[in-house]
Amino acid sequence: MNQKTILVLLILAVITIFALVCVLLVGRGGDGGEPSQLPHCPSISPSAQPWTHPGQSQLFADLSREELTAVMRFLTQRLGPGLVDAAQAQPSDNCIFSVELQLPPKAAALAHLDRGSPPPAREALAIILFGRQPQPNVSELVVGPLPHPSYMRDVTVEHHGGPLPYHRRPVLFQEYLDIDQMIFDRELPQASGLLHHCCFYKRRGRNLVTMTTAPRGLQSGDRATWFGLYYNISGAGFFLHHVGLELLVNHKALDPAHWTIQKVFYQGRYYDSLAQLEAQFEAGLVNVVLIPDNGTGGSWSLKSPVPPGPAPPLQFYPQGPRFSVQGSRVASSLWTFSFGLGAFSGPRIFDVRFQGERLVYEISLQEALAIYGGNSPAAMTTRYVDGGFGMGKYATPLTRGVDCPYLATYVDWHFLLESRAPKTIRDAFCVFEQNQGLPLRRHHSDLYSHYFGGLAETVQVIRSMSTLLNYDYVWDMVFHPSGAIEIRFYATGYISSAFLFGATGKYGNQVSEHTLGTVHTHSAHFKVDLDIAGLENWVWAEDMVFVPMAVPWSPEHQLQRLQVTRKLLETEEQAAFLMGSATPRYLYLASNHSNKWGHPRGYRIQMLSFAGKPLPQNSSMAKGFSWERYQLAVTQRKEEEPSSSSVFNQNDPWAATVDFSDFINNETIAGKDLVAWVTAGFLHIPHAEDIPNTVTVGNGVGFFLRPYNFFDEDPSFYSADSIYFRGDQDAGACEVNPLACLPQAAACAPDLPAFSHGGFSHN
């Protein structure tokens, strides 16, 4: 081979190698190698925007930091120098417990929203604890107008018919600290021998923690609480590490020095005091079960034992978000509404409109309840009325990518509770549009003609979460393109446990060597103020019946014909359905206006609940949560019946501040402004798979509000997201099928913000 031939071959080899490299580079850019740089998707700022001008939507906006500060300053001046910061207040002190928005009267709000009248005065509601007065009491004061308050008025008598007894007040954080100090510094040393033996006791080392129960006693006027003791497991749920010791603390006295331990329960037996327990232990009369301190190992920890894997699926907005959040107002092409958070009652929405027409004045969580069973005193007496702790107060920051989609819009919440200055929960709400991965409607036709039509369901969601002791609640309000509204809550977090002893099968399941997962029910109550084509509404019940008949063309044969039954419910008693009773399968509120087909325009309430049995009515505390007895009740709307529960019901359910059953007094509901009160819940018998946490799957309940002849046809028919093509069309052409354009429209990389978390303390 001559030199010239070799040179030609070398040149050809270089060209071939260069061509192969080019092919490889192009291939890697398009088929899974190092990706070529995609353009960023167009986007609007993912954060909520502040108010740009005074507007109607601010009627329902929670108080700003500036407004909370102004109210606090005004009250401090008016109530005098005797006020103590609630963060350090003793029971014998005067303090401002809470300040939050006083909702405007509905008539005044609608006059402003619909007729352009001046907005009602913006006001705050403050709860004051007067422990230093000759007759200690709790008062409610309305302060206004905001942002520059000039008046306050005492509304305690107006709201409650008289002064509120002081024993009904919520337990302040300082009171819990004083109880802990009493238990650990004064009481537990009396049983140090037993505690060293069973529980690795370290005086002042605090390897143990307490957990409260509620209510606090056995009759009105009591303030005596069972506290369970658990290992203090850092970084994991102590709720699963019960050591078998429970203490009944009487903390009714205004001076903590006079608080006492009334009873002691240890691993299945009752004692009069810790000193008696210690004496019997020293005498060899106490059968002690040693409880290992497992630390954060095993299944108690939420830290995964496996390394991270590939990134999970991610939803994003290829052409930018299709909704906006300004202040507390959410707007999309279909839905608008205002949102907020009651300090005690939790999430709420107002002035909900679909395609510009108001459907709902208010949907608000009212109360949540967990009733426990067990063979220890703490377990058997626990009825957590969560509004008494505060479902807004104990809202938590939402973790991006876990609690909500990574690209959701996050909104802060400002509050003033047990403090002289307002605090902020960062990312307390999230708002997002979600593709459900499910068709809202579809049909594929191979019969007579060939075509496909459908619509992928995308929903607008607003979400918040509350962590109340061991449980985490997810509160969802979901808006569908069909005009339906879905309200749902989920329970997750840690179960509440008890020390395992005796015949436990009646009270739950064993979930660890010494741990009983105690049976309990979850219930939540919602206020639904529907305004269907106006304020005058009627309640209709429809169901089904089979009616026997002779077959018309063959009379000797019988046929069971399915028919619809209809009944107008005219009184509150007729529209109050007890838990477990037969409820019409279709119950809807309707106006006296008709749709195109002559039917009353209505909205149906469809339950999604498998609630446990309510507390028997002969229970001494049943009045404290009488709403739990009704799966659904419809009443006349009254300003003097704003809520079905009260922050004060937890600590005195025996003489309830608000008894919901009083709302149902057989008044007419025909052609009136109506409120539907809905209970959703479920029975939870904890099991092994609740360790370490209860999962949301199967533990979500709620209800739908669905149009029922409200429209002339399905409003989603007009959705710009609809897809339709025939068999003789090219479904891959953009002009025929918008989904065919998706490879170009969505050929962009989402602009992901840096991960952030709202933290574990509020500033």
Swiss-Prot record:
One GO term of the cellular component aspect?
membrane
Instruction: Tell me the residue numbers annotated for binding Ca(2+) 1.
Output: D529, L530, D531, D673, L674
Q: What positions are modified (2',4',5'-topaquinone)?
A: Y471
Membrane topology label: Single-pass type II membrane protein
Q: Which regions of this chain are Extracellular-facing, per the record's topological domains?
A: 27-763
Tell me which EC number(s) this protein carries: 1.4.3.21
State which ranges are Cytoplasmic (membrane side): 1-5
A single GO BP annotation from the record? amine metabolic process
Family matches, as Gene3D superfamilies: 3.10.450.40, Copper amine oxidase, catalytic domain
Q: What is its main location?
A: membrane
Cofactor comment in the record? Binds 1 copper ion per subunit. Binds 2 calcium ions per subunit.
Binding positions (Cu(2+)): H520, H522, H684
Give the UniProt subcellular location, in the record's own words.
Cell membrane
Active site, per annotation: D386 (proton acceptor), Y471 (schiff-base intermediate with substrate)
**Alphabetical UniProt keywords:** Calcium, Cell adhesion, Cell membrane, Copper, Disulfide bond, Glycoprotein, Membrane, Metal-binding, Oxidoreductase, Signal-anchor, TPQ, Transmembrane, Transmembrane helix
**GO molecular-function annotation terms?**
copper ion binding; primary methylamine oxidase activity; quinone binding
Q: Which residues bind Ca(2+) 2?
A: E572, E641, F663, N665, E667
User: What transmembrane ranges does the database entry give?
Assistant: 6-26
Domain of life here? Eukaryota
Q: Name one Pfam family in it.
A: Cu_amine_oxid
List glycan-bearing residues. Answer: N137, N232, N294, N592, N618, N666
**Cystine bridges:** C198-C199, C404-C430, C734-C741
Biological role stated in the UniProt entry:
Catalyzes the oxidative deamination of primary amines to the corresponding aldehydes with the concomitant production of hydrogen peroxide and ammonia. Has a preference for the primary monoamines methylamine and benzylamine. Could also act on 2-phenylethylamine but much less efficiently. At endothelial cells surface can also function as a cell adhesion protein that participates in lymphocyte extravasation and recirculation by mediating the binding of lymphocytes to peripheral lymph node vascular endothelial cells in an L-selectin-independent fashion.
Oligomeric and partner information: Homodimer; disulfide-linked. Probably forms heterodimers with AOC2.
Please state which protein family the record places this protein in.
Belongs to the copper/topaquinone oxidase family.
What name has this protein been given in UniProt? Amine oxidase [copper-containing] 3
Classification from the root reads: Eukaryota, Metazoa, Chordata, Craniata, Vertebrata
Q: Which gene encodes it?
A: AOC3
